[in-house]
Amino acid sequence: LFASNSSLVAAKVAERSAETGEHYITRTAAEYRSMVKKAAGGGLVIAFTTLAKFALYALALSAFWAGFWAGFNYAVSFVLVQLLHFTVATKQPAMTAPAMAAKLKELGTGDAIESFVDEITHLVRSQVAAVLGNVLVVYPVVLGIALLMLHTLGQPPINTKQAEHVLESLHLLGPSVLFAAFTGVLLFASSIIAGWAENWFVLHRMDSALHYNPRITGLLGAERAARWARFLRENLSGFAANISLGFMLGLVPAFAAFFGLGLDVRHVTLSTGQMAAASATLGLQVLQMPAFWWAMASLPFLGALNVSVSFYLAFSLALRAQNVSGVDRARIYAAIRARLRTAPLSFFVP
C-alpha cells in the first residue's frame, strides 16, 4: 500500500513539474534571447543577495541564526526573482527533467529519436544560456558595488582574511565539487516540495475555495478574489520551491556542522558573486594569486554539478513515476553522439 501510494504521489508531483518544466526549454532564437535576459535579471538580484550575505557575516550571529537569516535572505531573493519573471539557472533542471521523461514515452521510430535529441539540444543550450546569463552579470555587478563601497566608505564588503578564505573555499581541488553535487540534491528536493505543494493545492481545489469562499469574496470582492486564486494557482509551486531551497541552503550547513558532518553548499551563481567580492578586496594582485585561478576554474564544475545532479535525480524519479521502460538507450546515445559530431554548436546556440 505504501509503495503504491508513494508511486502515485511521485507520478502527480512529476506531472506538475513537467507542466512547469516546459516553460524552461527554449526552442527558438527569440526564446533563447529571452532566457538570457531573464537569467541576466536573476544575476542582478543575486548580486545583492551576495552582498546581503556578507552583511549578515558582520553581525557575528550564532550558527543557527546565521543559517536562518542566510536562508531568509536566499528565500526572499529567489521569490523576488520569480515575481520579476527572471530566472536562476540551477533551479531549472529539476523542473525540466519530468518534461523530458514524458517525451520518452513517445519514442519508437527513428524520427522520434531525432526529435528527442532535438529536445536535448534545446534543453542543454537553455541551461547554458541561463547559467551564463546569471554568472556574467553577478560578477561585474558585485565587483562594481564592492569597489564603489571601497572608494566611498573606505572599506569593501569583506576584509582580506575573509576574501582569502572565499578563494580557498572554492578551490577546484578541495571539497567544493562535492558540495556542489550536494547542492544539486537540495535543488532536487526543492522541486519535490514544489510539486507536492502544487499537487495539494490542485487536489483540494484551493483556487475554487479562494474564489468562492463567502468571507474572502466579502472581504476582497469577487473579482479580486478570483485574481488572487489565479495568482496562487500559477505561482504556488514557485513559492514553495524558492522558499524551501532558500532555507535549505542556509540551514542545512548549520545543522550539518552541529552534527559534525562538515557539509556545505556551493551554488554557482552565489559562489561567483562571492569571488567578485573577494576580487574587489584583494585588488589587482588577485590576478597573481594561484588560489584565484583555481577558484575560477572550479566555477564551470560547480555549475555542471548543480545542474546535472538535480536533473539526474528528477529524471530518474520521473521515469519511475511515469512507468517509462523499454527505452532503447543505445540508439539515443548514438543519436546524441552523432549530433555532437555533426552540429556541436547546436548544444550552445540556436
Report each predicted region and the residues it spans.
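Long, compositionally biased intrinsically disordered regions
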Residues: L1, S7-A14, H23-T26, R205-P350
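Generic detector of multi-pass transmembrane helix bundles and their immediately adjacent loops
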Residues: N73, K91-P93, A97-M100, K105-Q274
